[in-house]
From Swiss-Prot:
Residues 1-31 are annotated as: Disordered. Component of the mitochondrial small ribosomal subunit. The gene is MRP51. This is Small ribosomal subunit protein bS1m. It comes from Eremothecium gossypii (strain ATCC 10895 / CBS 109.51 / FGSC 9923 / NRRL Y-1056). InterPro entries: Rbsml_bS1m-like. The lineage of its organism: Eukaryota, Fungi, Dikarya, Ascomycota, Saccharomycotina.
């Protein structure tokens, strides 16, 4: 075997490959999940020139993290970019100690647009595909822009579930099978929705066992677990944040390494009028209420402004709890028309007719 053939075999082998990238190293597109191989550029690694690649990196590159898509090239110089990308988001979440919640059928924060977005390869599955507002539409991948071909595919899926639905009725509600002609159609369709919801929360494989859902490597903590600190048990996560924009009712807030837009109401209006543009120099406490991980990997956080009692009385806010929230997210939201209740009801009616029709 010649050296060229051996080199070709080695280059094409699994031990000499990195995951195939889904795009260029540097792209302005939104990145919610890792897209390239990432290495940590420590001081000791830079000194020894060891990164696991077959060529060295220029010494002037001092970035902490590097991404690349090849171990070696014909020019003996690997293309790389000094971008931390997803790594910095993971570090920020771990520093906060917040456990992200997955978007599931029981959560009300998942919209139809997020439910039908491309799934995150780190944790895709039926367990996070169901929307609480439009369960049938989101389960079968139907949106306001679905064409006739997608509808045909959804109808085939419903028809394929008919034998399983009949067996489920025999096990859980046998009276519906025995007295089918005397049952109310509304009750019958209600059981069909219950059946769809049950199978949507289970894995499509593994013999129907519950699917283990992770947090994409953002954290390994458990929700509800007590956190220890030098001052005792830590029950809430409070971080400092700044108000970046005060024009109009929309406020831009920077907190915990994330920047987002949200409604803060009129509680800070007097502070805005008094400080003007200098409000950016003031730091306000924000409590991290919830971190939510959507199906496409987008991270959405609920931050609540904390107002001291003396400050509230000083500005005439009263003793009521401030319930205003601002939504802190990784990147901009995608504007898409949501499915109305009438459209969802019409779609559910057609799909349930197919599922409950045992005669065909």
């Amino acid at each position: 075997m010649s050296s060229s053939n051996l080199s070709s075999i080695l280059r094409n082998s699994r031990i000499a490959q990195v995951p195939k990238p889904k795009g260029p190293l540097f792209s302005p597109d939104k990145k919610y999940v890792p897209t390239h191989q990432l290495i940590e550029n420590k001081a000791s690694t830079m000194h020894r020139q060891e990164w696991g690649m077959k060529s060295s990196i220029p010494s002037r590159s001092k970035s902490r993290y590097l991404i690349f898509d090849e171990l070696d090239t014909q020019q003996r110089l690997t293309s790389f970019e000094a971008i931390g990308q997803y790594q910095w988001n993971r570090i920020r979440i771990q520093e906060l100690g917040v456990v992200p919640e997955r978007a599931t059928a029981g959560n009300s924060f998942q919209t139809s647009a997020d439910a039908n977005a491309p799934s995150n390869p780190l944790f895709s599955g039926f367990s996070s595909r169901l929307s609480a507002r439009t369960p049938l539409s989101s389960f079968f991948g139907l949106t306001s822009k679905s064409d006739a071909k997608q509808w045909k595919a959804a109808e085939k899926k419903v028809a394929a579930l008919r034998p399983a639905f009949k067996k489920w009725l025999q096990d859980h509600h046998p009276h519906l099978i025995i007295h089918k002609d005397q049952m109310d159609p509304a009750d019958f369709r209600k059981r069909a929705v219950e059946f769809i919801t049950e199978i949507a929360t289970r894995s499509s494989g593994a013999g129907g066992s519950w699917k283990v859902v992770g947090n994409g490597g953002l954290t390994y903590g458990l929700k509800g677990r007590l956190q220890q600190s030098p001052l005792g048990i830590k029950q809430n996560t409070v971080v400092e944040g700044r108000i970046l924009q005060t024009n109009g009712m929309e406020k831009s807030v920077a907190a915990a390494g994330f920047v987002g837009n949200g409604m803060l109401g009129t509680n800070l209006r007097k502070v805005d009028y008094a400080m003007g543009d200098l409000v950016r120099t003031a730091r306000f406490p924000f409590e991290v209420k919830q971190a939510r991980l959507l199906e496409n990997g987008r991270l959405l956080m609920d931050m609540s402004l904390i107002e001291p009692k003396n400050t509230a009385r000083k500005y005439g806010y009263g003793a009521k709890e401030n319930k205003n929230r601002t939504y802190i997210f990784q990147r901009g939201a995608v504007n898409e028309r949501k499915i109305s209740s009438e459209e969802s009801a019409q779609q559910a009616e057609e799909l349930l007719n197919i599922l409950t029709n045992f005669e065909n």
